[in-house]
Amino acid sequence: MTSVSRFPEPQAVTSPLTEYAVFLVVTIAPGHEAAQTARDVVGEVGDLVRAVGFRSLHGGLTCVVGIGSEAWDRFDAPARPEHLHPFVAIDGFAHDAPSTPGDLLFHIRASRHDLCFELERLILDALGDAVSVVDDTPGFRYFDARDLLGFVDGTENPVGDGLTDAAYVDGDGDFAGGSYVVTQRYTHDLAAWGRLSTEEQERIIGRTKADDVELADEVMPSNSHVVLNTLTDDEGNDLDIVRFNMAFGSYAAGEVGTYFIGYAKDPAITEEMLRNMFVGKPAGNYDRILDFSTATSGCLFFVPSSATLAMLDDLPPLAEATPTPPAEATPPTPDSSLRVGSLRGEYER
């Protein structure tokens, strides 16, 4: 098992689920001055968290900072995380997973919404016109950590050492203790979902609705959400991610949904789960939850350890002549096999 003590101090990736969150995604404006401002602020977010958190010592305020592929290059860091690349859009069997812009992620969590709001305000004030906000979604914990479809979400998150093993990079030199995070915003058609019987809903999810018990193997559909999100390696070991999804909604905007945020030591694990959902395993045997939940965004970020994040603040100033790089070519499609073994009998959601 991996121990956190082997790493530089991680960011607060594995902090417990809170009552409130803000998912803030921004893009950085062209030019070295904007990149310099963004890099400076990213390195100083910890100071802002302490300043706001001191006002409520029991508020549980944290902020995880993620850096996108193009932004990492613009920051002129001396090295690059091994698996960092833009989120690859998925052309699914019946539904698609889009790739959308995002240079920086600020995943803010607290037990009070005012703490989240105040930290977000200070971050955006510091960034100024160096960035544009492309996603600003306030999330909330819905009853006993259920999604708006009525099912408990994140039941099978690993615990203990397994949580550390799943969330943090072990190796990769200076990037040990970091994490890769994928974010997606899903909107739900609750009216259509509500027309299904509870039994139909349970077969789509793979768990009972009232008491959150996994369906027995003999009645578990092969395209249930649980089955398609269960991966093992060639030795039969579980390949897990850590989810901190939250509900969101605005009836004025006419949308309700789930903000998916999944942390992993290797983004290929999350990407394999998403391909299973959208393409199906085998192809065409896709996740029927997508008939009621539409992905409207998709980003991938690297979450450096706290030490690496602080290191960015100590780098030499960006040279004025440094051009804004052209858009990256789409990276090669990750190996769809991931060396993943057969789906096991015990599934997870």
Q: What residue spans do the PLM features occupy?
A:
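Long, histidine/aromatic-enriched segments associated with O2/redox biology
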Residues: M1-Y347
